[in-house]
Amino acid sequence: TIEENNLDWCYSLRQIYDKDGNYVCNDDCESLGKWQSYHGINHIDTNCYCLKTEVAIKLAQVWHGGWGQDRVFLSAMSQYFSKFDCTGEYTVNYKVDGNPGSVNAEFFHNGNKIMNEKYNGVFPWRKI
């Protein structure tokens, strides 16, 4: 996606799995990048990024902070490197319920239901 479209960076979508490794659903509600999540923010999960080396080096310091830096990083990336896109494919496997503070399958089922109603089942981030 980066090379084909002359982008600075891109991101992939997520498939959600439970703690036992069973497929739950696609993430059509949270890590959507250009499109707001069902709770009204733009978000890309840390493991969904693909960056050109020079971009990663220039913004590496943005990761320093703590919980929530993925949101800060997305803001900086969008501001300073605006040539980006979503691959439109669900190529990242994300496991839920890993610890007591983790989101669970219900989070994605509920969020996906809200987004399905909002977009009438036609999600603009999908390219498959």
What is each stretch, according to the model?
Residues 15-22, 47, 87-118:
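Active-site donor/metal-binding and catalytic loop motifs
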Residues 65-73:
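Acidic donor-binding loop at a coil-to-helix junction in glycosyltransferase catalytic cores
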Residues 75-93:
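Catalytic donor-sugar/metal-binding loop of nucleotide-sugar-dependent glycosyltransferases
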Residues 9, 48, 66, 83-84, ...:
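A residue-level structural signature of the nucleotidyltransferase/glycosyltransferase Rossmann-like core
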